[in-house]
Amino acid sequence: MANKEMFEDTVEERVINEEYKIWKKNTPFLYDLVMTHALEWPSLTVQWLPDVTRPEGKDYALHWLVLGTHTSDEQNHLVVARVQVPNDDAQFDASHYDSEKGEFGGFGSVSGKIETEIKINHEGEVNRARYMPQNPCIIATKTPSADVLVFDYTKHPSKPDPSGECSPDLRLRGHQKEGYGLSWNSNLSGHLLSASDDHTVCLWDISAGPKEGKVVDAKAVFTGHSAVVEDVAWHLLHESLFGSVADDQKLMIWDTRSNTTSKPSHSVDAHTAEVNCLSFNPYSEFILATGSADKTVALWDLRNLKLKLHSFESHKDEIFQVHWSPHNETILASSGTDRRLNVWDLSKIGEEQSAEDAEDGPPELLFIHGGHTAKISDFSWNPNEPWVICSVSEDNIMQIWQMAENIYNDEEPDIPASELEAQGS
């Protein structure tokens, strides 16, 4: 039995490597930007910070990322990294392809383009880190313990204390177990939600400050789910509404003005397996998406949750992340265990397709990012550069990429099909 499993693993590894080679060869036709960077340790979390600096006379802009570490047994850190993202006119073109190396000059390799600016000691791996929209210097993190930690990175040295002591600015209490879901309210400063394996969602208001020491107790604990709560998200336009999803296969919508914390305003059987993630559309107040272990992303309308609007189907394994584009109302992306990040366009649902195109996926599947060779842990849309995404995977790899403009602008590519190597062949 063990031999059979080893053989299957070797075959899978070979397939993954082969697919990666094909992907790499096709990058100049599929992307306007690809930066691949190996982190010292894998990060389970990634989020672009909202700041951008455009140095005069340079062909790049400076952006910042919030990352974490997931080490074997060494000290873990919360990390802020600075990234040089090339301007449109500096990005690579097909003429830089080095056929011997099988990769691009220009922006394929990124030595010196990504640098760690701040490293803060952290208790255990960083399950997730998210900045507060009203003050991006404040970052909340999920840890392997039940506590949620809050750091103001301006109050910490850029190099961590070698003793390894973790000293968060606040410690948020209320959970019994660890978890992943974390969401700041974009309309109410300091209001933070967290989802946990203890089946609950906790709400804190950190603007009130700690009662004693650095500890803040939960303002409310929501107990509607009957299993691990995987994710939680505030509505982006209504300050009192939020959603939660869990291993009980349910999507629940809550209103903090309600006088009960044990029963949601709405509860829907969203999927046929665990629901791992959710995201509210930033432009449309009624639309949200959920991602599931059933390999689908579901589209919902808050006005009629009994009816699933659409199911996006192409992933071959569990979906753990789903995020709407900050720039385009109809664009969302999803990723997970199958090593793929899919970008979807709602406006293409139901479009006619040739049989050949249908083999690649439904018409609403705009793009498949195939650059990762391990499970994708998290991804983030850049708020300042449309269509730029940063994704991180379990094998330490971080990629910053932007699909080719002709893909989202619906222009016909000017490459003969004979030049493109099929990803499946």
Swiss-Prot record:
Keyword Coiled coil tagged: no
Any GO MF annotation of the entry: histone binding
Xref: Pfam families: CAF1C_H4-bd (PF12265), WD40 (PF00400)
Subcellular location(s) of the protein: Nucleus
Cellular component aspect of the GO annotation: ESC/E(Z) complex; nucleus; NuRD complex
InterPro entries: G-protein_beta_WD-40_rep (IPR020472), Histone-bd_RBBP4-like_N (IPR022052), WD40/YVTN_repeat-like_dom_sf (IPR015943), WD40_repeat_CS (IPR019775), WD40_repeat_dom_sf (IPR036322), WD40_rpt (IPR001680), WD_repeat_RBAP46/RBAP48/MSI1 (IPR050459)
Sorted UniProt keywords: Chaperone, Chromatin regulator, DNA replication, Nucleus, Repeat, Repressor, Transcription, Transcription regulation, WD repeat
GO biological process: chromatin remodeling; DNA replication; regulation of DNA-templated transcription
Presence of keyword Transmembrane: no
Record Gene3D superfamilies: YVTN repeat-like/Quinoprotein amine dehydrogenase
Extent of the WD repeats: 47-122, 128-173, 181-217, 228-269, 275-312, 318-369, 376-403
Recorded superkingdom: Eukaryota
Annotated PROSITE patterns: WD_REPEATS_1 (PS00678), WD_REPEATS_2 (PS50082), WD_REPEATS_REGION (PS50294)
Sequence similarity: Belongs to the WD repeat RBAP46/RBAP48/MSI1 family.
Function: Core histone-binding subunit that may target chromatin remodeling factors, histone acetyltransferases and histone deacetylases to their histone substrates in a manner that is regulated by nucleosomal DNA. Component of several complexes which regulate chromatin metabolism.
Quaternary structure, from the entry: Binds directly to helix 1 of the histone fold of histone H4, a region that is not accessible when H4 is in chromatin.
Protein name per UniProt: Histone-binding protein RBBP7
Organism this protein belongs to: Xenopus laevis
Gene this chain is encoded by: rbbp7
